[in-house]
């Protein structure tokens, strides 16, 4: 009977929603408030290009600091419109993306991924580096976080087949005044050896 009760408590414990402790909640609320304030500057058409990019540099620093916090993956971000936050159905990764528009109406995309390292049982943070201008045939190239066809992701589809999860990201890149790109991107993660 003791084993049965212990198993029930273990199962109930696994089913409870993951939450941050009070101290981490307060810390993450502070990051969220700071990020939303900075995103207002990043997306403001009244700001000059250099002001938007300077604010975005601050966003990058704060975002990375926030994502590197212990248990930050549990935080449910409420970021302003224009910032996409998508999480896979199996909770293996999350992607956060946004764009800065320059004075020529060209989009430069930015983003981060939090990916579960199952061996270490921690989420690793990857900064996505927009190399759209250098990628001439995106459909023929294997892309990485260091060589990313930048976009704002609008949907993350999780598919399970033969016991393994597969992911498809759908996105949009504003390009410039004459072009826009719709992006369909299959995603997989290599296991670190």
PLM regions: where:
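Structural signature of eukaryotic scaffold interfaces centered on beta-propeller domains
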Residues: 79-92, 148-163
